[in-house]
Curated annotation (Swiss-Prot):
InterPro entries listed in its UniProt record: Cupin_1, Germin, Germin_Mn-BS, RmlC-like_jellyroll, RmlC_Cupin_sf
Top-rank taxon: Eukaryota
Function, in words: May play a role in plant defense. Probably has no oxalate oxidase activity even if the active site is conserved.
CDD domains on file: cupin_OxOx
Record protein name field: Putative germin-like protein 2-2
Organism of derivation: Oryza sativa subsp. japonica
Localisation per UniProt entry: Secreted, Extracellular space, Apoplast
All residue ranges annotated as the Cupin type-1 domain in the record: 67-217
A GO term from the CC aspect: apoplast
Subunit structure: Oligomer (believed to be a pentamer but probably hexamer).
GO MF: manganese ion binding
Cleavable signal peptide: 1-28
Glycan-carrying positions: N74, N82, N168
Length: 223
């Protein structure tokens, strides 16, 4: 168990270094720091692009801390995957730091479905198992880039592009990813298109996808 724990910590350190690189200078999508830190003041009613700062004298070590990435997420769902997010909502000290982390667990044949991060580049590394990953570039080419990742492999999903990860192995898989924003956002393509509230008209979707409306209605019913 000690060896497994040490290995996990080493892998976590690698991802942390990648996260720092990802958030450095102009590469980060968030504004640069103007002070040492700006811990979120959760009691403030001020609304800004980001979050207001807590008084520095009230900041404690716990504002920069999160525990739980060693714990596997529950993958008993339709997609067979689970994302554990560590961004500014979990660590208020990440405010203005331009970086966050996620742990993604995958059951065999588990999928993190096609989605985008509108405010961040993502750099995942596989901790256990193997993953088939890919992203699609913008119009008009819509070219698909794919790769099979094994333990220790790293890949890059450029900011804003649709991407996915699929566990193509027979065992559980785990990945840890750094993102270049304190609040990357996520838009899951299927949920956005077929599960919006209120729903997008089936006439519009039928024309967009060049299928009958009854097919659109059946798909929307799944969301």
């Amino acid at each position: 168990m000690a060896a497994v724990g040490a290995c996990f910590l080493q892998q976590l350190a690698v991802v942390a270094l990648l996260a720092l690189w990802c958030s450095h200078g102009a590469i980060a999508s968030d504004p640069g720091l103007l002070q040492d830190f700006c811990v979120v003041d959760k009691m403030s009613q001020v609304r800004v692009n980001g979050f207001p700062c807590k008084d520095a004298k009230d900041v404690v070590a716990g504002d920069f801390f999160f525990s739980g990435l060693h714990m596997a997420g529950n993958t008993t769902n339709k997609q067979g995957s689970n994302v554990t997010t560590v961004n500014v909502a979990q660590i208020p000290g990440l405010n203005t730091m331009g970086v966050s982390l996620v742990r993604i667990d995958y059951a065999p044949n588990g999928l993190n479905p096609p989605h985008t991060h509108p405010r961040a580049t993502e750099i995942p590394t596989v901790l256990e198992g193997s993953l088939y990953v890919g992203f699609v570039i913008s119009n008009p080419e819509n070219k698909l880039f794919t790769k099979v990742l094994n333990k220790g492999d790293v890949f890059v999903f450029p900011q804003g592009l649709v991407h996915f990860q699929f566990n193509n192995g027979t065992n559980n898989a785990v990945a840890l990813a750094a993102l270049s924003s304190q609040n990357p956002g996520v838009i899951t393509v299927g949920n956005a298109v077929f599960g919006s509230k209120p729903s997008i008209s089936d006439d519009i979707l039928a024309k967009a996808f060049q299928v009958d409306k009854n097919i659109i209605d059946r798909i929307q019913a799944q969301f």
